[in-house]
Every structure is written in C-alpha cells, then in structure tokens.
Swiss-Prot record:
It comes from the Bacteria. Coiled coil: none annotated. Residues 9-85 form the GIY-YIG domain. This is UPF0213 protein VC0395_0675/VC395_A0575. The lineage of its organism: Bacteria, Pseudomonadati, Pseudomonadota, Gammaproteobacteria, Vibrionales. Pfam families: GIY-YIG. CDD domains: GIY-YIG_UPF0213 (cd10456). Belongs to the UPF0213 family. It comes from Vibrio cholerae serotype O1 (strain ATCC 39541 / Classical Ogawa 395 / O395).
C-alpha cells in the first residue's frame, strides 16, 4: 500500500485571464505556486507584461501529467466563448468532449 509521500502529485489544468481579457491555459502540480510565478514574471513568457493577471479556473486531472497535457491541448483548441463557458461554470469538460472528437 502506498503512503501519502509515495503517491504521485496531482496535476491541474488552469486558466489565467490577462488584462486584455485573453485566457492563458497551462498545467501544474501546484496552482497557487505557478500563479505566483506568473504574477512575478517568472512563469510563461506569453504572460509577461500582460498583467494584472487573474486565476479564473482550475481543474484537477486524476490521470497524471500526460492526461493534463492532453486536456491542456484540447482546451487551447476551444473557442474563446467555449473557454468563457468553462470559467463561468456554464459548461463542464465532459460536456465539451463531443467537441474534442
């Protein structure tokens, strides 16, 4: 039986809103740490100079980094209105699965 120390870190997919209202999608094992990096300009180059930033959505991914990367790729392919529906809670990932096929 695995102890807590032996369990793999959960992965998360998240969306950050930039000052220009654009949505940035990324993955991490620690959302608050990664968002703090983005705010300090030490995160993704795509977000540098785009502040103030707001963390608007995150979702834990149970199946590890590979699954998180695949979901990130799929979310990046969504339209702005579909991403906004996720943020507003008007759509869930499983509802958007049809789009991914």
């Amino acid at each position: 039986m695995e102890t807590l120390a032996e369990l793999p870190s959960p992965w998360f997919v998240y969306l950050v809103r930039c000052a220009n209202n654009a949505l940035y999608c990324g993955i991490t094992t620690d959302v608050s740490r990664r968002f703090a990096q983005h705010q300090k300009g030490r995160g993704a180059k795509a977000l540098r100079g785009k502040g103030p930033l707001e963390l608007v959505w995150s979702l834990p991914v149970a199946d590890g980094k590979s699954a998180a990367l695949k979901l990130e790729y799929r979310i990046k392919a969504l339209s702005k209105s579909q991403k906004e529906a996720l943020v507003a809670g008007m759509a869930r990932i499983d509802q958007l699965e049809i789009i991914f096929q």
